[in-house]
Design a protein with these regions (language model features):
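N-terminal pre-domain/capping segments
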Residues: 1-90, 106-116, 123, 159, ...
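Acidic-and-aromatic substrate-binding clefts and catalytic sites of carbohydrate-active enzymes
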Residues: 1-8, 26-40, 62-73, 98-103, ...
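Acidic/histidine-rich catalytic cores of soluble enzymes
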Residues: 22-23, 57, 116-229, 281-284
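Short beta-strand segments at enzyme active-site cores
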Residues: 24-25, 55-58, 90-96, 127-133, ...
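Active-site groove signature of glycoside hydrolases
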Residues: 84-105, 128-140
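Active-site clefts of carbohydrate-active enzymes
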Residues: 219-223, 245-260
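A short, acidic, amphipathic alpha-helical segment used as a generic capping/interface helix at domain edges
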Residues: 227-241
Length: 290
């Protein structure tokens, strides 16, 4: 994830020599005055020269509510959908939004009101919408940002937005932290996965067994791939076996150990770990003439 506001181009320029192959350009709630076509034009020479890509755009906020920031989030989604092709990508990711403080099911009428026009906008431009599976501290009964964090909610979501252009931005971390096994879940839902975040998790089984999930001590942590408990080789195999041709973009800045001065050490380790799990570098099959 390479969104850094007005410094995004400089940040991508710094990341390219580290070996990153793709970048998600992400925003929090608003575009912060950034003109997306101009940003796309700034990034294009860097991407072309390095053979890297923008995999997706992302807007994280709550487009279902009516506060000033929420309405800016909705406008940012419209602009991101319009601009995605200029970045050479066809995916815009983010949260569904949520009617704050209400159960998941109570958000569905408002979800349809807001998202059906956005889905139509995306369909007209050949763009896909991918909802991240992050609960943002919410539960089924209450929350502030997102309802697309659980398979029960996905069923409601996809029934409300019956378009092949609507899917998931999936990562194992958020499922592990809900005590869900990500491998069988991915097998079931892989056809709906449009984009993947490279983020892992670690469960403290002793804490879970002795203190449960509601104590003062956390029972799980977000980790960079390679430091967590996910079998990324299996995940990549499931994705490839289902025909997935998208990116896995590392979501950093969460690992409790590889942080601060170790942040990029952890992210580059995660990159190399994922590259090994996919089988390393691409190797052409030999061509033997008859």
């Amino acid at each position: 994830m390479a969104g850094r506001g007005k410094r995004t181009t400089d940040y991508v320029r710094a990341l390219i020599p580290l070996g990153f192959e793709s970048f998600q350009i992400n925003f929090w709630q608003t575009l912060d005055g950034i003109e997306l076509p101009r940003l796309a034009a700034e990034l294009r020479p860097l991407l072309d020269a390095s053979g890297t890509i923008v995999s997706s755009l992302a807007v994280f906020g709550n487009p279902l509510e009516t506060g000033e920031k929420d309405m800016e989030t909705r406008r940012a989604w419209e602009k991101a959908i319009d601009a995605a092709p200029e970045f050479g990508c066809d995916i815009v990711c983010g949260f569904t939004g949520r009617v704050r403080g209400k159960p998941v099911s109570d958000s569905i009428p408002r979800l349809k009101e807001v998202w059906l026009p956005l889905v139509e906008r995306a369909e007209a431009r050949g763009v896909r919408i991918a909802f991240e599976n992050c609960p943002m501290g919410g539960t089924w009964e209450s929350g502030d940002w997102n309802i697309a964090f659980n398979p029960d909610a996905w069923e409601l979501l996809f029934a409300a937005l019956p378009s092949g252009r609507v899917g998931l931005e999936w990562e194992p971390c958020h499922q592990i932290c809900q005590l869900i096994d990500p491998i069988p879940q991915l097998r079931e839902w892989v056809s709906r996965v449009f984009h993947v975040h490279g983020k892992d998790a670690e469960i403290d089984r002793h804490c879970l067994a002795t203190r449960g999930i509601s104590g003062a001590k956390p029972f799980c942590w977000h980790r960079a791939p390679g430091f967590g408990q996910t079998d990324w080789t299996s995940i990549i195999s499931i994705l490839r076996g289902a025909g997935y041709r998208g990116a896995i973009d590392i979501e950093g800045w969460h690992d409790p150990v590889y942080r601060d001065e170790l942040e990029m050490t952890g992210q580059v380790h995660a990159l190399r770990h994922l590259q090994r799990c996919r089988g390393g570098e691409f190797v052409l099959n030999p061509v033997i003439e008859a």
